[in-house]
C-alpha cells in the first residue's frame, strides 16, 4: 500500500530502486542518492524543480526564464524519470508537474545502464502516487499565499473489487491560480491524475495510471541590460533605442530592424563606427540628459541623441534609474502555455520466489506555445513511447541477483523558434509602459504587407529510434563486500527535417539529415560494510549523455556525448538509526550539447558533498547538507550572447550582440584557468524542527550560498547570501495547518542564468519574503 512505503523523515525509512533496479536501503546503494519522502517534501516546501536546490548538497538551479522544466544537478541538466522510465526532455516548456508524484529519489551523477542515456548532471526518479489497498482514505488541501497564490488539491483512494479481482485506485486533482512577485508573470495550472492497481491472477499484477496537465503562464525574462552596477546597486540603464517601428509590422518592429553586432577581437575596447551607427545605442531621456555637463551633452549622437564611444572615452557615465526586482522583461500579452499527457503501465509476473518478469510501458506527450513581445517565440510538440522488459532473478552464491532486459523507444519532436539571439536588452523595463518600439514581430506573426511569410527560423522535426539491451547485478564476495555492476549497449538512429510551418526556409518539408549512433555504458560499484550500519563505496562509470535541443529534438550525433564518473563515499546510520549521514567525493567529465553551435561543450568537475538527517530526540530533528564543486571548461563556449563591460552595454543594448568562443579575449584575461562559472562553488542548507507539544511544531533554518561569477568572462559577480526560511505547523486530529515563509529577512539575492547562453544579458532578482498558509483535512 502507498501508505506503508511512503516513508518518514529519515532517508532510510523507505527503500529505493532508483539506481540498480532492485529495492535497497539508501545505506547500501553505492551512489549519491537523496531520498525525498512525502513528509520531507512537505516540510521543505518542495513544489517544483526550483526547490530541489534546497534539499541536495551543492544544489543550485539557474533561471530558465521562470519555467522550471528540467532539474539541474551538479551544475548541469539532469534527466527526469517516472517510475523508472525516462520522460521527455523539455528545458523550460512547462514546469514539470508534481501533481502525480508521491516522492522522489535524486541521483547525482550520470545514470547507470539500467536507466539509459540521459543528461549528464544526474537524474530524478518520480515515484507516482500509488493506490491504497488497505482502506479508503483521502485529503483535501488548500493553500493561499502572497501575490494572490491559491492552490487546492483533492486526493482520494482505496480498495475495490472488480470482476472478482482485488483492485485499488488513487485519484488526485490539483488546481492553481497564482500571480507572482514579478509584474505580468503568472503561474496557473491544473493536474488530473488517476492510477489503478489490480491483481489479475495469482502471480500477475497490473499498475497503471495517467495524468493530464495544463499550464498557463508566460516567461520571466528577468532584468535585462545587466551591469555590475545593476547587480550591486539596482541602477538600471534608462532609455529607449532608435525607433525602428514600421507600417509593415503594424506599428511595431520587424526582426530585420534589430541591428546585429558580432564581437571581434577589437571589441574588448570601445569600438568606433560599427557601434555609433549600429542603432543599438541607448537614447537617454531628455530629463536625464539635462543633468549632464554641456561638454558631455555635445558628445551624444548629433541626430538621435544616443550614446557614442566618444561620450564614454571622455569619461561620461551612462544614466541610470533605480529599479525593483519585480520589474522584469514581461508583457501582459505574453504567454507560455503547455499541455502534457502522461500514461504508464507496469505488468509484473512473479514467476517464482526468485524470478520476476516485468514489462513497463510509457507514453509522454507535450505541446507548448510561447510568445514574448520583446522578440521571442517558441512552439514545440513531442511524443515519446517506450516499452521495457526486465527479468529479475535472485541466486545463491557469488552472483546474488541479476536483472536483464531490453528497451525499445521512439521519440518524435518538432520545434519552431524565431532565432537563436534574442534582443533581450532592447526594451527599457523601467518604463511602466511597453512601447511599440520594444515589441518585435516573431514566430508565427507576419508582416502586414510585402513578404508576409511568418518568422519561424532554426526549426526542426526529428524522429529518434533507440533499441537497447541492459543488465545489472550484484556480486557478493562476503558478508561485508559486494559489487554492483551495470552494462548497456544501445543503438540509435535519427532523421531531421524542416517543418512545413517554417515558411522562410526553401527546404521546408524536406529531410535534411539522418544518422545513427551506437554506444555503450558500464559501471562497477563496490560497497564494503565496515559494520551493519556503516558502508564505504566506490563508483566508476563510463557512459553516454544524451542531451536533446530545447524542444526535445535529436538530429545530430553531437546530441550524444561521453560522460564519466569516479565517486567514493561513506554512509552511516548511527545512534539507534536516528542519524543518517553520507559523504561523497567525485570527479567527472561530461559533454553537453550546445544547440546554438550544434556541438558539444565539455566540462570537467570535481566536488565534495555531505548530507545528514538526525532525529536528536522525539521533539528535535535536524536536516543538513553541504556541497563544494569546481568545474572547468574543456573548450571555449560556442555561440552565445557576448559579455559587455560597464561602458559597453549602453552602446549595444538595442542590438543582437553575440560572441563565439572568446572573441573578446575576456575569458583568457579574467578566467585563465577556464572555470565553468554560473553557480556558487559552495552552498549549504540547515533545517531544524522542534515539536512544541499540543500539536505545534516549528521548523526553520538558513540556506547559505557563496559568492560567484555569473559569466565565464567574470565581468559580472554575485554576492554571497544567507536566506532564511521557516514554518509553523499545527496538527489536531484530521486537520493540519502550516504557515511557511521563505526569505524571511528579505535578503537581496539573485537567480543566475545558464552561462552557456544568456548570463551576460539576463539576471533575475529573487523575491523578498513570501508566505503560504496551508490547510489540510485528512479523511
Language-model region placement:
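C-terminal beta-signal and adjacent terminal beta-strands/loops
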Residues: 622, 631-632, 704-711, 730-779
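Outer-membrane beta-barrel domain signature, strongest for Gram-negative TonB-dependent receptors
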Residues: 191-403, 410-411, 580
Amino acid at each position: 500500500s502507498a501508505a506503508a512505503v511512503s516513508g518518514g523523515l529519515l532517508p532510510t525509512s523507505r527503500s529505493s530502486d532508483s539506481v540498480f533496479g532492485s529495492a535497497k536501503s539508501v545505506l547500501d546503494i553505492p551512489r549519491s542518492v537523496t531520498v525525498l519522502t512525502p513528509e520531507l517534501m512537505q516540510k521543505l516546501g518542495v513544489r517544483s524543480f526550483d526547490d530541489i536546490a534546497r534539499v541536495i548538497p551543492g544544489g543550485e538551479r539557474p533561471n530558465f526564464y521562470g519555467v522550471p522544466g528540467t532539474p539541474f544537478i551538479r551544475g548541469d541538466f539532469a534527466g527526469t524519470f517516472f517510475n523508472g522510465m525516462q520522460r521527455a526532455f523539455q528545458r523550460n516548456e512547462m514546469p514539470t508537474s508534481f501533481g502525480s508524484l508521491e516522492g522522489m529519489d535524486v541521483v547525482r551523477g550520470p545514470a547507470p545502464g539500467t536507466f539509459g542515456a540521459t543528461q549528464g548532471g544526474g537524474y530524478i526518479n518520480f515515484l507516482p502516487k500509488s493506490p491504497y489497498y488497505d482502506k479508503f482514505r483521502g485529503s483535501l488541501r488548500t493553500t493561499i499565499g502572497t501575490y494572490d497564490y491559491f492552490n487546492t488539491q483533492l486526493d482520494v483512494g482505496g480498495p475495490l473489487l472488480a470482476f472478482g479481482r482485488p483492485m485499488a485506485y488513487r485519484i488526485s486533482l490539483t488546481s492553481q491560480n497564482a500571480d507572482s512577485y514579478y509584474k505580468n508573470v503568472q503561474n496557473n495550472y491544473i493536474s488530473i491524475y488517476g492510477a489503478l492497481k489490480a491483481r489479475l491472477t495469482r502471480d500477475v499484477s497490473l499498475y497503471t495510471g495517467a495524468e493530464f496537465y495544463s499550464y498557463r503562464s508566460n516567461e520571466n525574462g528577468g532584468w535585462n541590460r545587466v551591469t555590475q552596477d545593476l547587480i550591486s546597486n539596482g541602477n538600471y540603464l534608462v532609455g529607449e533605442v532608435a525607433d525602428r517601428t514600421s507600417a509593415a509590422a503594424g506599428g511595431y518592429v520587424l526582426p530585420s530592424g534589430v541591428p546585429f553586432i558580432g564581437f571581434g577581437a577589437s571589441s574588448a575596447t570601445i569600438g568606433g563606427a560599427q557601434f555609433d551607427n549600429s542603432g543599438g545605442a541607448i537614447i537617454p531621456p531628455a530629463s536625464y540628459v539635462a543633468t549632464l555637463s554641456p561638454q558631455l551633452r555635445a558628445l551624444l549622437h548629433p541626430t538621435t541623441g544616443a550614446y557614442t564611444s566618444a561620450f564614454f572615452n571622455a569619461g561620461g557615465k551612462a544614466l541610470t534609474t533605480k529599479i525593483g526586482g519585480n520589474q522584469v522583461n514581461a508583457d501582459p500579452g505574453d504567454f507560455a502555455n503547455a499541455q502534457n499527457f502522461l500514461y504508464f503501465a507496469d505488468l509484473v509476473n512473479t514467476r517464482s520466489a526468485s524470478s520476476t518478469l516485468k514489462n513497463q510501458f510509457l507514453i509522454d506527450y507535450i505541446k507548448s506555445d510561447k510568445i514574448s513581445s520583446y522578440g521571442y517565440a517558441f512552439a514545440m510538440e513531442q511524443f515519446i513511447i517506450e516499452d521495457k522488459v526486465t527479468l529479475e532473478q535472485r541466486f545463491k552464491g557469488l552472483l546474488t541477483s541479476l536483472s536483464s532486459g531490453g528497451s525499445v523507444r521512439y521519440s518524435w519532436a518538432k520545434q519552431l523558434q524565431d532565432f537563436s539571439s534574442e534582443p533581450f536588452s532592447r526594451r527599457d523595463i523601467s518604463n511602466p509602459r511597453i512601447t511599440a518600439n520594444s515589441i518585435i514581430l516573431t514566430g508565427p506573426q507576419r508582416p502586414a504587407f510585402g513578404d508576409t511569410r511568418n518568422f519561424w527560423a532554426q526549426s526542426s522535426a526529428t524522429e529518434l529510434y533507440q533499441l537497447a539491451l541492459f543488465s545489472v547485478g550484484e556480486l557478493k564476495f562476503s558478508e561485508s563486500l559486494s559489487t554492483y555492476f551495470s552494462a548497456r549497449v544501445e543503438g540509435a538512429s535519427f532523421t531531421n527535417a524542416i517543418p512545413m510551418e517554417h515558411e522562410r526556409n526553401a527546404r521546408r518539408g524536406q529531410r535534411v539529415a539522418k544518422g545513427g549512433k551506437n554506444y555503450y555504458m558500464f559501471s562497477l560499484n563496490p560497497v564494503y560494510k565496515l559494520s551493519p550500519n556503516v558502508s564505504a563505496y566506490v563508483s566508476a562509470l563510463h557512459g553516454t549523455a544524451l542531451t536533446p535541443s530545447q524542444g526535445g529534438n535529436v538530429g545530430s550525433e553531437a546530441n550524444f556525448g561521453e560522460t564519466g564518473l569516479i565517486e567514493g563515499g561513506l554512509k552511516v546510520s548511527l545512534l539507534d538509526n536516528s542519524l543518517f549521514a553520507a559523504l561523497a567525493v567525485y570527479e567527472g567529465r561530461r559533454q553537453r550539447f550546445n544547440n546554438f553551435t550544434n556541438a558539444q561543450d565539455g566540462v570537467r568537475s570535481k566536488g565534495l558533498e555531505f548530507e545528514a538527517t538526525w532525529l536528536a530526540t522525539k521533539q528535535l530533528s535536524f536536516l543538513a547538507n553541504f556541497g563544494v564543486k569546481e568545474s572547468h571548461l574543456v573548450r571555449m563556449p560556442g555561440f552565445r550572447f557576448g559579455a559587455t563591460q560597464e561602458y559597453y552595454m549602453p552602446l549595444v543594448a538595442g542590438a543582437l550582440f553575440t560572441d563565439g568562443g572568446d572573441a573578446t579575449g575576456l575569458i583568457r584575461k579574467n578566467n585563465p584557468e577556464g572555470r565553468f562559472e554560473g553557480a556558487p562553488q559552495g552552498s549549504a542548507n540547515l533545517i531544524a524542527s522542534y515539536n512544541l507539544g499540543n500539536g505545534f511544531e516549528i521548523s526553520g533554518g538558513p540556506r547559505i550560498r557563496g559568492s560567484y561569477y555569473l559569466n565565464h568572462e567574470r565581468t559580472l559577480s554575485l554576492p554571497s547570501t544567507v536566506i532564511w526560511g521557516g514554518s509553523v505547523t499545527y496538527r489536531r486530529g484530521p486537520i493540519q495547518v502550516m504557515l511557511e515563509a521563505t526569505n524571511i529577512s528579505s535578503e537581496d539575492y539573485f537567480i543566475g542564468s545558464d552561462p552557456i547562453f544568456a548570463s551576460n544579458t539576463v539576471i533575475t532578482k529573487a523575491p523578498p519574503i513570501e508566505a503560504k498558509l496551508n490547510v489540510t483535512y485528512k479523511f
